[in-house]
């Protein structure tokens, strides 16, 4: 991610004072801001005036290495922050990544550009509902399945 001097993102009061946002750790807030800074938008004219529409939402990403570079935190802090953002409903993973070199995990930020669309904003329901089941789990270890110890066996030689 490159730093830019383009305009920033303003949080609405409903987001800023929500239970979901106030219970985030500082590292989680930093990761959320990094993902929001990755978003690109275009202005669309409507009856109510100009509105922002994010064009690459669902395609934003931040790797552990980038997070460590920007914040000075460790890998486990990145994972805890990402998991907390998913649990609280601020982001949703759209692509797992990691299958080959250059394949990154991609996320969708669930905060509307103008603070108008409330239908997709999961964080509004946070205290009553969480999305812990959406947190990606490590895949089961399948290598060496046949050579592992069976029930009743031991490696002890008599």
Map each language-model feature to its residues.
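Intrinsically disordered, low-complexity segments enriched in small/polar residues
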Residues: 8-9, 19, 76, 105, ...
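Short recognition helix of helix-turn-helix/winged-helix DNA-binding domains
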Residues: 1-64, 114, 125, 157-158
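Winged helix-turn-helix DNA-binding recognition segment
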Residues: 41-108, 112-113
